[in-house]
Amino acid sequence: MATVPELNCEIAAFDSEENDLFFEADRPQKIKDCFQALDLGCPDESIQLQISQQHLDKSFRKAVSLIVAVEKLWQLPMSCPWSFQDEDPSTFFSFIFEEEPVLCDSWDDDDLLVCDVPIRQLHCRLRDEQQKCLVLSDPCELKALHLNGQNISQQVVFSMSFVQGETSNDKIPVALGLKGLNLYLSCVMKDGTPTLQLESVDPKQYPKKKMEKRFVFNKIEVKTKVEFESAQFPNWYISTSQAEHRPVFLGNSNGRDIVDFTMEPVSS
């Protein structure tokens, strides 16, 4: 962040009429105290800005006026070529601004202090260990069933986003959205039981690096299989039933539920 330092020398104040004259379209008529030389009249010489080594006592408005003046110089209609380049102002910016780091001690859920970085995504299909595919049955419900032939195209493609969360050697936080749809798997409490649902989101806001915890799953690799544990409800996993054509749900791995999946990457 750039701030204007307090300086220790007097400079004449500009009033609005002087500023209007200073920024006249024809050309600047005079520049007070800021430059030792500024020659616009000689067609054989380029514009040269010379900065006094003595710090000047400028308010922020005067500093901005200087920058606006330079912008006006760029736009002046002159018949002679100028060698005034974009990099020229950099020589005196250090006299006006001081650079300070922006520090953040904590993160909060309203994302006001979170600067999202580009999200790494992987498109994939998931099948349970019985080779049942996941399909979108109702507008907001996934079901697991066996597909073959032309029906194989019905299985959903997930957009797996690698998000912020508690990362360990065997757990990677991810969010699971349905590719091409504004739907994400999320975990909420319903009637006292952790429940898996498909939640509609604003595509302008999602995906993002810091997803709400209900959207986050810990991807756990077990040999050639993967499991997805809810970050909101530890020890509860995305599960399928032993039976055919049953909804995908959140289970607590009691031995009857299927929690192991194979992941098939899909080109984007």
UniProtKB/Swiss-Prot annotation:
Keywords of this entry: Cytokine, Cytoplasm, Inflammatory response, Lysosome, Mitogen, Pyrogen, Secreted
GO biological process: astrocyte activation; cellular response to antibiotic; cellular response to fatty acid; cellular response to glucose stimulus; cellular response to interleukin-17; cellular response to lipid; cellular response to lipopolysaccharide; cellular response to mechanical stimulus
Induction data: In pancreatic islets, release is increased by high glucose treatment and, to a lesser extent, by endocannabinoid anandamide/AEA. The induction is more pronounced in Zucker diabetic fatty (ZDF) rats compared to lean animals.
Pfam families, sorted: IL1 (PF00340), IL1_propep (PF02394)
Cellular component annotations (GO), alphabetically ordered: cytosol; extracellular region; extracellular space; lysosome; secretory granule; vesicle
Coiled-coil stretches noted in the UniProt entry, renumbered to this chain: none
GO molecular function: cytokine activity; integrin binding; interleukin-1 receptor binding; protein domain specific binding; receptor ligand activity
SMART domains documented for this protein: IL1 (SM00125)
Site annotation Important for interaction with integrin: residues: K171, K179, K190, K204
Location(s), subcellular: Cytoplasm, Cytosol; Secreted; Lysosome; Secreted, Extracellular exosome
UniProt cross-references to PROSITE patterns, sorted A to Z: INTERLEUKIN_1 (PS00253)
Propeptide: 1-116
Subunit (UniProt): Monomer. In its precursor form, weakly interacts with full-length MEFV; the mature cytokine does not interact at all. Interacts with integrins ITGAV:ITGBV and ITGA5:ITGB1; integrin-binding is required for IL1B signaling. Interacts with cargo receptor TMED10; the interaction is direct and is required for the secretion of IL1B mature form. Interacts with HSP90AB1; the interaction facilitates cargo translocation into the ERGIC. Interacts with HSP90B1; the interaction facilitates cargo translocation into the ERGIC.
Role this protein plays: Potent pro-inflammatory cytokine. Initially discovered as the major endogenous pyrogen, induces prostaglandin synthesis, neutrophil influx and activation, T-cell activation and cytokine production, B-cell activation and antibody production, and fibroblast proliferation and collagen production. Promotes Th17 differentiation of T-cells. Synergizes with IL12/interleukin-12 to induce IFNG synthesis from T-helper 1 (Th1) cells. Plays a role in angiogenesis by inducing VEGF production synergistically with TNF and IL6.
Additional record remark: IL1B production occurs in 2 steps, each being controlled by different stimuli. First, inflammatory signals, such as LPS, stimulate the synthesis and promote the accumulation of cytosolic stores of pro-IL1B (priming). Then additional signals are required for inflammasome assembly, leading to CASP1 activation, pro-IL1B processing and eventually secretion of the active cytokine. IL1B processing and secretion are temporarily associated.
Family that this chain belongs to: Belongs to the IL-1 family.
Protein name per its UniProtKB record: Interleukin-1 beta
Taxonomic lineage: Eukaryota, Metazoa, Chordata, Craniata, Vertebrata
